[in-house]
Amino acid sequence: MSYNFIKSNKENDFYPVNQSEIEEVEKNLNLKLPSELVNFYLEVGYGFIKGSEFNTNRILDPYSVRDFRLRINDFEFYPDIEIYDEFENDKLIFFEGSESALMSIELNDNNKNPIYYYDIQIATSLTEFLRKIEENDQYYLDLLDDE
């Protein structure tokens, strides 16, 4: 999978991730990270997608994904973190749209991993999600209105 559409935007800001970091986090969590997320980490890394003024649009690094899941370090006292308890059973928080908008990626063995905002599917794959975020980094809010 090529993420050139993300890499080619010079306003995006990414940092490399190596295989050993991914393996360490998988061991710490006792689970396999979704294949699309692993591929993205290895091809692009983690970091920020340029968007609107008030959104962070941060793809969490593997250690932050782990820390959120375990509620440790920076996430130990994260505001209202307990809200996500019920939405994480088969998903993993990986993206921070804003402080109050966190997205999760489905844990499955498929080549495509659906993306969720709370329990609402907002994209069928990581690639679709990233393309939509680049176009409109608040598109998922409109989907909430439809529910």
Curated annotation (Swiss-Prot):
GO terms for cellular component: cytoplasm. The keyword Thylakoid does not apply. SMART domains: SMI1_KNR4. Induction: Expressed on rich and minimal solid media likely in early stationary phase; dependent on DegSU. Not expressed in liquid LB, but only under conditions that promote biofilm formation. It comes from the Bacteria. It is found in: Cytoplasm. InterPro entries: Knr4/Smi1-like_dom (IPR018958), Knr4/Smi1-like_sf (IPR037883). Immunity component of one of 6 LXG toxin-immunity modules in this strain. They promote kin selection, mediate competition in biofilms, and drive spatial segregation of different strains, indicating that LXG toxins may help avoid warfare between strains in biofilms. Mediates intercellular competition during biofilm formation; disruption of the operon disadvantages the bacteria, but overexpression of the cognate immunity protein restores growth in competition with wild-type. In situ neutralizes the toxic effect of cognate toxin YxiD. Probably interacts with cognate toxin YxiD but not with other non-cognate toxins. The interaction inhibits the toxic activity of YxiD. This is Immunity protein YxxD.
